[in-house]
């Protein structure tokens, strides 16, 4: 039986372990923390004598493929929910929202009426779906993506526009209104301050919609997203995966295929036939000798997150009939302002450059899944904080 060692017990490491142990491998996970979960873990707060759990990192579920959700066994343990109501978008000094309907024909009418959009919204959605199906096929069949495969499956025009092109060119191709471009291009900078003028940034837009667990939409997990990794950990342990927590890796010897790590009882060495790093990109470059000393990567970013608690269910001034809807507040009115704010945060010329706030109504979603909690919850995800500072160092 071949031995596989996985470094990291976030959702990617846990999913890999699940498939590999069921394929007949001897699988060991090494995790430096005292718990599994990676970014999908919980924190707790006691308010007025009542304890409430909330997501420490990731909050919403959306990018997981449905086949992974089913084949790992998670679908038997997890209750999920995604809003069928329209997303709601606000711009500065506007009290009434624009509704982002899931039906593209309704959306086309709404954007034309509210934002003066004269572009090709249906074409955008249809072409995006072609790219999404291509991405999902790569996932399902475990195909390494190449430009040749993209050109063969999608054709040169779609590939150049949606995969290799810039977000700016993609948005200009389909939309006439800056507000439409801002909303559709918002995901380009969610994970980092990428420039909309950089080649390849167009691909982020369909990628962020490529999960199939909720049919391409984003939603919530009953109790909290940490139930994904908690349940998957338990499933894996029952399948025979070994998980070593509180383990500090000292060295990786790729010649002898040995990994050395310290635990409470001292240093342990583990032989492997295959080694998988299910971590951030920095970890392998630090642990593997002469991996690539020229690579310099950062652990900082430009995103911020606030979890707000309320004694009573929230009542919205606008569209209160849609309590489960995601809401988006934009501080920018044009792609030019959007780009400047994102890039200024990268240049570290200030602590905060307003971009947008995404509001996740976690408390309302929990109620929709019959999970009654002591307080209502809103999660506010915001851009753009200074790139080189951590939260504690920002000017409050």
Model-derived regions: residue spans:
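N-terminal glycine-rich phosphate/pyrophosphate-binding loop and immediately adjacent elements
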Residues: 2-134
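Generic, well-ordered alpha-helical scaffold segments in large soluble proteins
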Residues: 23, 170-174, 231, 235, ...
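Rossmann-like flavin
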Residues: 94-199
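Glycine- and acidic
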Residues: 153, 186, 211-220, 303, ...
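Residues forming anionic-ligand binding surfaces in small-molecule and nucleic-acid pockets
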Residues: 201-212, 373, 384
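Helical element adjacent to the flavin cofactor pocket in flavoenzyme catalytic cores
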Residues: 207-251, 255
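Mid-domain catalytic core of redox enzymes
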Residues: 250-371
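FAD-dependent oxidoreductase catalytic-site/capping-region signature
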Residues: 355-396
């Amino acid at each position: 039986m071949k031995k596989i060692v996985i470094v990291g017990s976030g959702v990617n490491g846990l999913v890999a372990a699940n498939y590999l142990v069921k394929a007949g491998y001897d699988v060991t996970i090494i995790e430096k923390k005292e718990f599994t979960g990676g970014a999908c873990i919980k924190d707790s707060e006691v308010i007025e004598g009542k304890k409430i759990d909330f997501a420490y990192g990731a909050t919403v579920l959306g990018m997981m493929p449905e086949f992974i959700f089913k084949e790992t066994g998670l679908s038997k343990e997890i209750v999920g929910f995604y809003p069928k109501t329209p997303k709601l978008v606000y711009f500065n000094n506007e009290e009434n929202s624009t509704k982002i309907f899931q039906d593209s024909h309704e959306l086309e009418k709404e954007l034309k009426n509210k934002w003066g959009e004269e572009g090709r919204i249906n074409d955008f959605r249809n072409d995006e779906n072609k790219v999404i199906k291509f991405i999902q096929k790569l996932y399902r069949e475990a195909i390494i993506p190449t430009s040749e495969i993209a050109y063969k499956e999608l054709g040169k025009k779609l590939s150049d526009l949606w995969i290799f092109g810039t977000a700016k060119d993609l948005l200009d191709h389909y939309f006439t209104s800056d507000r439409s471009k801002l909303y559709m291009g918002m995901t380009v900078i969610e994970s980092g301050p990428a420039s909309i003028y950089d080649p390849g940034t167009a691909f982020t837009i369909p990628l962020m919609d490529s999960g199939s667990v909720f049919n391409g939409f984003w939603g919530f997990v009953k109790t909290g997203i940490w139930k994904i990794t908690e349940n998957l950990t338990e499933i894996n342990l029952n399948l025979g995966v070994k998980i070593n927590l509180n383990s500090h890796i000292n060295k990786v010897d790729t010649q002898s295929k040995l990994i050395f790590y310290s635990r409470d009882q001292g240093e342990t060495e583990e032989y492997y036939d295959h080694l998988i790093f299910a971590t951030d990109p920095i970890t392998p470059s630090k642990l593997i000798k002469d991996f690539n000393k020229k690579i310099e990567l950062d652990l900082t970013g430009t995103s911020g997150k606030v979890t707000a608690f309320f004694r009573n269910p929230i009542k919205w001034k606008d569209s209160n009939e849609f309590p489960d809807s995601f809401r988006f507040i934009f501080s920018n009115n044009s792609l030019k302002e959007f780009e400047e704010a994102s890039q200024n945060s990268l240049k570290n010329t200030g602590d905060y450059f307003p971009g947008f706030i995404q509001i996740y109504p976690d408390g309302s979603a929990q109620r929709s899944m019959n999970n009654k909690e002591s307080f209502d919850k809103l999660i506010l995800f915001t851009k753009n904080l200074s790139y080189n500072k951590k939260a504690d160092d920002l000017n409050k």
